[in-house]
C-alpha cells in the first residue's frame, strides 16, 4: 500500500461512487466542497493505492482558527476551541477535511501509517500544525495514541484534534 498525492478527478469520482461514500447529501457523489478543494489544488487529495487500486483517500486544505476556508467563518464555539488548542489566533494550519478507507482494509495499521505520512508531508510543504475533526472510534484511537491535543465540539458532536508538529531541526 502506498500514498499518492493527487489523482485524476474522474477516477477519484468513480472510486467514490463505487464505494458508496455518503458524499453530497448521501448520494454517493463527491460533494461540492470536496470537489472544489481538489480542483483548486490537486495536491490536496491523497489517495491510498494497493495494486494500483484506490482503497482510501484523504482531502485537506489550509485553514485558520477564524475561518474553515477563506470566506467561510467558523462559529464561536469552534473558534474558541481552536484558539484554546492552538494557544491563540493562528493562520497557516492544515485541516484534514476527510479520511476514508474501504472497510475491508481497516484494522491493518493503514490509518497509523497515514498519519505518519501526513505529518511529514505537511511539514515538507511548510506547515507546522494541523487540525482534524473526528467521531469515528478508530480515528479517535489513532489521534489519542499519537498524543494530539483534544477537545469536544458539542455543536457538531465531534472531537477536535490538534497537532503542533516538531520541526526537522528539533528531531
Model-predicted segments: where are they?
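Conserved acyl-donor/pantetheine-binding loop and adjacent beta-alpha core of acyl/acetyltransferases
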Residues: 54-98, 106
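C-terminal "cap" of GNAT-fold acetyltransferases
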Residues: 136-137, 152-171
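Conserved GNAT acetyl-CoA-binding A-motif
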Residues: 93-94, 115, 122-135
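Short beta-strand micro-motifs in enzyme catalytic cores
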Residues: 44-46, 92-94, 157-161
